[in-house]
């Protein structure tokens, strides 16, 4: 019989994560690496694990994520949203808890585009009076 999988997509800045949950012991793999080895920072690890800890499902699911684009911070946020969406698919009763914690909301903040005549999005060239 085929193993049960739950799927969630997460996006943050320019990062896109595809997250698969399967019943298991609670391992988290990102791009075929262990979570700590991939992200490298404890704070980002905590961000990724937040949805599992809030719902109390930390040891019930194995998480396998493939993530591309953006930097590691954006990727961590994308994985977090993907996990939250997959948890709702696995158990719809978790939706109010995740919604209240704000884990089902896609963060709309994006990098502002650079404008011509400026050095960056808002940074103007140095002004000289004389």
UniProtKB/Swiss-Prot annotation:
UniProt feature, compositional bias: Basic residues: 111-130
GO cellular component: cytosolic small ribosomal subunit
Matches recorded under Pfam families: Ribosomal_S9
The entry's keywords: Ribonucleoprotein, Ribosomal protein
GO BP, sorted A to Z: translation
Presence of keyword Ribonucleoprotein: yes
GO molecular function: RNA binding; structural constituent of ribosome
Region feature Disordered, mapped onto this chain: 105-130
UniProt record similarity statement: Belongs to the universal ribosomal protein uS9 family.
Protein name: Small ribosomal subunit protein uS9
Organism: Desulforudis audaxviator (strain MP104C)
């Amino acid at each position: 019989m085929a193993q049960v999988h739950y799927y969630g997509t997460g996006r943050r800045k320019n990062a896109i994560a595809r997250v698969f949950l399967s019943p298991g012991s609670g391992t988290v793999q990102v791009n075929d690496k262990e979570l700590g080895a991939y992200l490298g920072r404890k704070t980002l690890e905590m961000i990724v694990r937040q949805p599992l800890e809030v719902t109390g499902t930390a040891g019930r699911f194995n998480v396998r994520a493939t993530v591309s684009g953006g930097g590691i911070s954006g990727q961590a946020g994308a994985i977090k949203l993907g996990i939250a969406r997959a948890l709702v698919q696995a158990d719809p009763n978790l939706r109010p808890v995740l919604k209240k914690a704000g884990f089902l909301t896609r963060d709309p903040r994006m990098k502002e585009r650079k404008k011509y005549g400026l050095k960056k999005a808002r940074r103007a060239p140095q002004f000289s009076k004389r």
